[in-house]
Amino acid sequence: MNADFMIDTNVLVYAVDHSAENSSKKKIAVDLLASVDFGLSAQVLQEFYVTVTRKIRKPLSQTQALAFLERLEVFPIIPSSYGLVLQGVRNSLKYQLPYWDGAILAAAVELGAKTLFSEDLNDGQLYGEVRVSNPFA
């Protein structure tokens, strides 16, 4: 279960966000998803579902969100596990990050990804084996 790149929640959210203020980010996200060999984590999928059905300006219906999630089944997905939780905590301590960001980094390592596309972490920073790239910067 390997992929060169891991996608963070915000990239997926922008790909389906229909609000005008995020239209340029939507295009970037859609183009990125169409052009790279990426993987995901269960955490990213969970965060995506909650965000697009409850938190964005024009929420998706639960059925629309489910349909999008079902299309992601073909990509490598790192499940949540006890080991991943522990490594997420270790990462949060080591890098002084919120736990959730530490867990995303742990999943990226497990996936074998060298690049994590995210706008939530420092663009260009190397966290162990994983470099963060902000596609919206």
Describe these PLM feature segments:
Residues 1-40, 55-63:
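Short, well-structured N-terminal submotif of metal-dependent ribonuclease cores
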Residues 2, 105-137:
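Acidic, PIN/NYN-like endoribonuclease modules and their adjacent C-terminal/linker elements
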Residues 27, 74-116:
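Active-site neighborhoods of divalent-metal-dependent phosphate/nucleic-acid chemistry enzymes
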